[in-house]
Amino acid sequence: AYKITDECIACGSCADQCPVEAISEGSIYEIDEALCTDCGACADQCPVEAIVPED
């Protein structure tokens, strides 16, 4: 799964790209690990590289 780091600027680009709607929007964006398919679309879209693979 991917995670959103503190670098997130809450722009919404990632949520728009997620094919399974695993990203919840808010002041802090979060990725639902149960829904995430590891496609990487969100990370590719992030303008500040705030989305990284979980260790």
From Swiss-Prot:
Keywords from the UniProt entry: 4Fe-4S, Electron transport, Iron, Iron-sulfur, Metal-binding, Repeat, Transport
Origin species: Butyribacterium methylotrophicum
Domain 4Fe-4S ferredoxin-type: 2-26, 27-55
Name of the featured protein: Ferredoxin
Its biological purpose: Ferredoxins are iron-sulfur proteins that transfer electrons in a wide variety of metabolic reactions.
GO molecular function, one term: electron transfer activity
Cofactor: how bound: Binds 2 [4Fe-4S] clusters.
InterPro entries for this protein: 4Fe4S_Fe-S-bd, 4Fe4S_Fe_S_CS, 7Fe_ferredoxin, PSI_iron-sulfur_center
Residue sites binding [4Fe-4S] cluster 2 per the record: C18, C36, C39, C42
Residues engaged in binding [4Fe-4S] cluster 1: C8, C11, C14, C46
Pfam families in alphabetical order: Fer4 (PF00037)
Gene3D superfamilies named among the record's database cross-references: 3.30.70.20
Cofactor(s) required, per the database record: [4Fe-4S] cluster
